[in-house]
Amino acid sequence: AAYFYGLFMQELEHAEKTNTPVDWNKMSTYRYIDWSITTPIMLLVLCLYMANNINATVKLTTYLSVVVLNYIMLAFGYLGEIGTTDRTTGLVGGFIAFGLMYAIIYNTFMSKYSFANSVLFWFYAVVWSLYGVVYYVGDGYKIAVTNVLDLISKCFVGLGLWAYYTKILAV
């Protein structure tokens, strides 16, 4: 993720130095490449964490279904971003895949009650749904807000899990 943030900064600095407009499509491409790498890992962590809390295992077919839906969600979003399809189609298609992906996770790992699972599941679901809300915001604001969402969904979740498993934080 840090590599892609470096590319964002280079793009912004280049536009400023050359007094040319920022290439938002290029920035979106960087963002979606980053997400294509990081989101499957984040979803694996979510599934492993939730399975561990209910003494279950993560079936490969379940994880692969979640990852395929994740890539479908990203594909719809990206195609809407770069104008291959309209944004509404990108948003609706992305949210359908998002809903199915989270339904699989919910049905698989929320069958037994676990407060910790509920907290993390709903945290992920709400934060990730905010990306869809920000989808219609102007490009400059969207980059800034998605950077904040990335910070929350990547860094803070990682820190929270570390704190939980080291028993510094009990849920």
Stretches with model-predicted labels:
Residues 1-33, 39-171:
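Polytopic alpha-helical membrane-helix bundles and their juxtamembrane interface segments
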